[in-house]
Structure formats: C-alpha cells, structure tokens
C-alpha cells in the first residue's frame, strides 16, 4: 500500500483515555436505559454490573491482541489472521453494519433531545443538521477528531459526576427538593428491588448490552495511537471503574430520587426525572449534556466505520477505493460513504419518528454481540496459534486466560437467545441472520472475482 494512503498516528494517550471513558457513555445510557428500567425495575443495577463484567472481558481479549499487533482494522484483521479470511470479512462488514445502526440510533436520539427544547420542529431537520456537521469534522485531521472527542467526553464525564454528587445531595439532604431528603426507599417501595422478577432483570440484559456497544472502538484507535503499548492498557483498565460510576452510579441516583415506574421515554430519563421534580434548571443542563453525548457517539461512529473500511480495503475485503486517504491521513471516501448511509436515518425519522429507536436498538444489539463473539473467538484462536513462550511474553494478557474468554462467549450466546425470545426484538434476529446470509453470498462472488483476476494475470 502506498504511503499516501496510510493513516497517521495522531491520537495521544489523553485522547484515547477519554475516548475510552466516553465511548460507552452515550445514547444507550442516556436514552436506552429507560427501556431497560421498564423491563427490570431497580434490579437493572444488577444487570448493568453483570453486563459490565462481560464488557470488560471482551475489552481485555481485544486489548491482548491490540497491544501485540496494533492495527487500524483491529478485530477484523485479528479474525482474518486467527480464524481465516471469511471470518475477517464477516466481522469487518458486520461491525460496519453495527455502527451504522448504532449511528442511526444516535442521530435519532439527537432529534428526540432537541424536541425537548423545540417540540414543534420535526426531528428529521435536527438529524440532517447533525449528520452534515459530523461529516465535516471527520474530514479534518485525526488530531482535530481526537481533540473534539476529548472535550465531548470530558464535558459529559464531568457533568455526570456533578449530577451524581447533586443526586446524593437530594437523597441525603433534600437540596433542591424543599429540604426533603428523598432517601433510597424508591429502590424497593414500588414492587420491590426485583419488581418484575428475576426474569425482568434477565430480559433487560439485551438493552444493557446495547448500552455497552461501542467500547470496542478502543481496539480501532490502536492503528492511530502514538504509543499503543501504554495507551491501550490504560484505557481498557479504566472500564470497570467507569461502569460502576457512570452506569450503576447514575441509575442508582435516578431511581432513588424518582420512582422507577414513572420514568418515561419521551426524552432522556435523566432529563425527565429532574423535570418531574420541578428542578428545571438541572433538566436543561442535562439535556445539553445528553446532546453532547449523542454528538460524541455519532462522531465516534463515523470514525470507527471509516477506519474499519480502510483496513478492510487494505486486506482485500472491501473495494480498494476505500483505502484512499487525504493529505491529512483521513480516509475521506469511507467518511463520505458513512455520511451518505446516515441520510437513511433522516428518512426513517421523517416517516416513523415515534418507533425508530427500539427497533434499531435491538438490531444493533445483535450486530454488536456478533462482533464481540468474533473478538472472543479470535482471542482463543490467537492464544492457540502462539507458542507457549510467546504467550508468557504477552504484555497485556486476559486475566484467567482462555477460560475467562469462554465464560464471556457463553454469556454472549445467551444474549442472542434473549433477543430471539423477546417478541418485540425477535425480528432483529431474523434481520441479523439475513445480513450474515447476504455476506456469505457476497463472499462467494468475491472469491469468484478474485479467482478470475488471478487466472487473467
């Protein structure tokens, strides 16, 4: 590959650490958590802890391979190297499909959040505006992207911490609630902690895993990280603490100060909770934060697909034109392709603004879980491929080795079973498997084309 089509290593440890902090703090938490709360009640806290453990196992498996061999197409390349070309092809394209679906959910959420302030403006106008703005940002240098993502993430992380502190002020001292402490009795006084039974908590796991979708972007940043051996482990090791603080902490506060069964879905439950309590100033600030979070998520979505398609083009799994980069090292063709695909979200928000999110979230969960399964299978094959002395020399090993990875794999297969069990999300399983069939057909055509090219040479 010519040097002019190479990506540039412009992401510092600071950029990558905050991308790790911010990557999973987005639409799944700020908006999708409402559906998870409805399914499980307060026991959704336990679901987020269980899902968080699985997410950390996936990140450690990806981190082990990323530190050993940092590459822009990351898990697609690892699947190709360890499981074969077909696995790499399916993984790369399914990740692009996943992130496109997630991005549609993110831009849809952006329109919903803007609707809180401007209820008379159609959602699709906001969706179109944000798609064009993010496209422009991603056509600049990777350093501009990293800097913008740093400040997006810094702002939402800082505000969530302030919100948690303020929430404890309401819980303990009644600040902003007329001096009346709310306590934490709401966690059990509306049907108990397991208000919808154990089954409700288990069923919520699919929405919980949607919230964690996107964390795998840290593997993709390895190709543009200045010092992947330091930055990747630091970023991944921050995962357990951020799950406890940002997911469990925020939802603990929300469900303590406001009954879980009155959390609505007409906007972010974070915003609606403060609105219902009459603290409109806090609600307005939080709406601005969730807007920032969705912008950050869309920004990362476009970045992730762009780098994945670029790497796949280098591997021969995507059209060669996708490997083209600008003078600044930006894969501009793939950024424009992603932007064009996102215009479909504008159309969806025009024809069915009320029902877009839940359908898209379940479809994204299937694609996300599929990619995670391929990451874990790649790590198992990667370990088997290495001689024992090289396994010992690995700089960032999965704790517990392959046994831990297999445990994560069983959990993810269970999540796919849940998607098929739930009537509202079963269709996403059909669409997901149809997507895999389409990819297999595409692979057959690709192989035939490659053979013809080889014969003609």
From Swiss-Prot:
Membrane-traversing stretches: 18-38, 39-59, 85-105, 114-134, 157-177, 198-218, 243-263, 278-298, 332-352, 356-376, 400-420, 425-445
Record topology, Cytoplasmic segments: 1-17, 60-84, 135-156, 219-242, 299-331, 377-399, 446-457
GO terms, biological process: amino acid transmembrane transport
Topology with respect to the bilayer: Multi-pass membrane protein
Any one Gene Ontology molecular-function term assigned to this protein's record: amino acid transmembrane transporter activity
Pfam family, one: AA_permease
Segments in the Periplasmic topological domain: 106-113, 178-197, 264-277, 353-355, 421-424
Keywords: Amino-acid transport, Cell inner membrane, Cell membrane, Membrane, Transmembrane, Transmembrane helix, Transport
Highest taxon in the source lineage: Bacteria
Location(s) in or outside the cell: Cell inner membrane
GO cellular component terms given for this protein: membrane; plasma membrane
Major subcellular site: membrane
Function: Permease that is involved in the transport across the cytoplasmic membrane of proline.
Family of the protein in this entry: Belongs to the amino acid-polyamine-organocation (APC) superfamily. Amino acid transporter (AAT) (TC 2.A.3.1) family.
NCBIfam families reported in the protein's UniProt record: PRK10580.1 (NF007876)
Protein name: Proline-specific permease ProY
Organism: Escherichia coli (strain K12)
């Amino acid at each position: 590959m010519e040097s002019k089509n190479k990506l540039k290593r412009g992401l510092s440890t600071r950029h990558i650490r905050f991308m790790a902090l911010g990557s999973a703090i987005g639409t799944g938490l700020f908006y999708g958590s409402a559906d998870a709360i409805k399914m499980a009640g307060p026991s959704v806290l336990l679901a987020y802890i269980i899902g968080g453990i699985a997410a950390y196992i996936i990140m450690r498996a990806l981190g082990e391979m990323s530190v050993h061999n940092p590459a822009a197409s990351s898990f697609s390349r690892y699947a190709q190297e360890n499981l074969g070309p077909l696995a790499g092809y399916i993984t790369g394209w399914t990740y692009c499909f996943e992130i496109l679906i997630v991005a549609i959910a993110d831009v849809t959420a952006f329109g919903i959040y803007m609707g809180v302030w401007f209820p008379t403006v159609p959602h699709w106008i906001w969706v179109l505006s944000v798609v064009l703005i993010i496209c422009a940002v991603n056509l600049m240098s990777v350093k501009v992207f990293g800097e913008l993502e740093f400040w997006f993430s810094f702002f939402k992380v800082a505000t969530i911490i302030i919100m948690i502190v303020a929430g404890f002020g309401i819980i303990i001292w009644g600040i902003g609630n007329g001096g009346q402490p709310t306590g934490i009795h709401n966690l059990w006084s509306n049907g108990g902690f397991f208000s919808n039974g154990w089954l409700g908590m288990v069923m919520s796991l699919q929405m919980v895993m949607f919230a964690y979708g996107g964390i795998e972007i840290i593997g993709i940043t390895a190709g543009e990280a200045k010092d992947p051996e330091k930055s990747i482990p630091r970023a991944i090791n921050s995962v357990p603490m951020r799950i406890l603080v940002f997911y469990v902490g925020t939802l603990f506060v929300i469900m303590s100060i406001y009954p879980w069964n009155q959390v609505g879905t007409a906007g972010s439950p974070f915003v609606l909770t403060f609105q219902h309590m009459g603290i409109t100033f806090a609600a307005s600030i939080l709406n601005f934060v969730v807007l920032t979070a969705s912008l950050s998520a869309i920004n990362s979505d476009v970045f992730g697909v762009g780098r994945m398609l670029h790497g796949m083009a280098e591997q021969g799994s995507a059209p060669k034109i996708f490997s083209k980069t600008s003078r600044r090292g930006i894969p501009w063709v793939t950024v424009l392709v992603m932007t064009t695909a996102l215009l479909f979200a504008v159309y969806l928000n025009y024809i069915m603004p009320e029902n877009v999110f839940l359908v898209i979230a379940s479809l994204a969960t299937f694609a996300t879980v599929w990619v995670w399964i391929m990451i874990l299978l790649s790590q198992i094959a990667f370990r088997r491929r290495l001689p024992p002395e090289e396994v010992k020399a690995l700089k960032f090993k999965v704790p517990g080795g392959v046994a831990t990875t297999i445990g994560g794999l069983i959990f993810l297969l269970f999540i796919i079973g849940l998607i098929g069990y739930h009537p509202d999300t079963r269709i996403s399983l059909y669409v997901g498997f149809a997507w895999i069939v389409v990819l297999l057909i595409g692979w057959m055509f690709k192989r035939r084309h490659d053979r013809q090219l080889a014969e003609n040479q």
